[in-house]
């Protein structure tokens, strides 16, 4: 019998090469995002079924981050680039997240039958208490884009005690006027539903540039298997009522609010007008340069930074959590008392595209930011 010999095999390339601490951290982050697929639920409401996905576990005495997407999108296509951004992990590890898909917008949703009465924007807002009751959540920090921002605002007006803060991107609080309707009808004669929705989501400059992002979202919407459902959500949004915000009146948002819009975005004027109607001691206004119509897609880093300071101002993240940002950013802040000598202050923060931060502390001021 041949004698057994011990043979030593050396790997040509190590399976686990040495990693720097930074690379190891990035790998850990990627693995955590990959493994955390969320749990999807559906709940029946008086206006039909609604689907939502929950990430993380509830944290004691902390609100849930609660998102609502815009027309033509679902929660993934609207929010994934933001919530999967590296620095955002500092925030989401401290909160449970609830991502709502408007009825018929969830992945794999069947097309509604002909003649289906899609919920109004007010009715979509009235579905939210059913979700929170199902999850046994008492308060939220809402993050909404476009139609989702409108829906969360309507909910906050009806249930102010359950909303601790709102981040409203591209909000238009006004109902469509006759001129808007005429323009909408005229556009409908010459443009398809996907093109009209793309014009709602992105600026004309972005659409003309036809970047990879635009090509991706044009394809997603044009070839969506639930395009009929998307059109119903679109019509619901275009039939919205005026929120009737009034500075100093009863119809106003009573929680801290951060308004966000891209410079030259389709909804820039509407967001500026909304800012003029809200309580200046509770409202921050973030106008983002070079971000187009969807800043959560094009500038997730800048929006993450703003969101961190917004949450910190609400008292939910200690300043020690901000050390990484503090090392990598510099701020230029000018504060001035208001002309009428009232207690509210106006703060203007100038940011270049490379550096700048939002001021920390409670959101007791109106803040206009260009970044």
Curated annotation (Swiss-Prot):
Record PTM Phosphothreonine, positions in chain: 20, 330, 334, 348, 357
Induction remark: Up-regulated by aldosterone in kidney and colon, but not in heart. Down-regulated in cortex by antidepressant treatments.
Modification type Phosphoserine: residues: 326, 328, 332, 335, 338, 344, 350, 352-353, 355, 370
The keyword Protein transport is assigned to this record: no
PTM sites of type N-acetylalanine: 2
The keyword Protein biosynthesis appears for this protein: no
Region (Disordered) residue spans: 1-22, 334-371
A GO CC term attached to the entry: cytoplasm
Function: Contributes to the regulation of the Wnt signaling pathway. Down-regulates CTNNB1-mediated transcriptional activation of target genes, such as CCND1, and may thereby act as tumor suppressor. May be involved in dendritic cell and neuron differentiation.
Name under which the protein is recorded: Protein NDRG2
Organism: Rattus norvegicus (Rat)
């Amino acid at each position: 019998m041949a004698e057994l010999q011990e043979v030593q095999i050396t790997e040509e390339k190590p399976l686990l090469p040495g990693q720097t601490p930074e690379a190891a951290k990035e790998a850990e982050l990627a693995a955590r995002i990959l493994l955390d697929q969320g749990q999807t639920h559906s709940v029946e409401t008086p206006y039909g079924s609604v689907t939502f996905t929950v990430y993380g576990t509830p944290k004691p005495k902390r609100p849930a981050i609660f998102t609502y997407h815009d027309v033509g999108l679902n929660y993934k296509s609207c929010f994934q680039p933001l919530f999967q951004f590296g620095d955002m992990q500092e925030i989401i590890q401290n909160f449970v997240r609830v991502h709502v898909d408007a009825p018929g917008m969830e992945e794999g949703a069947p097309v509604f039958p002909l003649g289906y009465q899609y919920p109004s924007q007010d009715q979509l807002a009235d579905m939210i208490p059913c979700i929170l009751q199902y999850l046994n959540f008492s308060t939220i920090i809402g993050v909404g884009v476009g139609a989702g921002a409108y829906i969360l605002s309507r909910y906050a007006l009806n249930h102010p005690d359950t909303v601790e803060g709102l981040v409203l991107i591209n909000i238009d609080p006004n109902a469509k006027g006759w001129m808007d309707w005429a323009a909408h009808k005229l556009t409908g004669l010459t443009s398809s539903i996907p093109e009209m929705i793309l014009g709602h989501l992105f600026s004309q400059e972005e659409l003309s540039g036809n970047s990879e992002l635009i090509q991706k979202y044009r394809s997603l919407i044009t070839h969506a298997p639930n395009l009929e459902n998307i059109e119903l959500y679109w019509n619901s949004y275009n039939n919205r009522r005026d929120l009737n915000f009034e500075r100093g009146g009863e119809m106003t948002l009573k929680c801290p609010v951060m308004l966000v819009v891209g410079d030259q975005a389709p909804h820039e004027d509407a967001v500026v007008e909304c800012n003029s109607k809200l309580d200046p001691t509770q409202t921050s206004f973030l106008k983002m340069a070079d971000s187009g119509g969807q800043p959560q897609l094009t500038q997730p880093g800048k929006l993450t930074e703003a969101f961190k300071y917004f949450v910190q101002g609400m008292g939910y993240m200690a300043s020690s959590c901000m050390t990484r940002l503090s090392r990598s950013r510099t701020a230029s802040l000018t504060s001035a008392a208001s002309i009428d000598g009232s207690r509210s202050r106006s703060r203007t923060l100038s940011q270049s595209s490379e550096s700048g931060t939002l001021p920390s502390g409670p959101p007791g001021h109106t803040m206009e930011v260009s970044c």
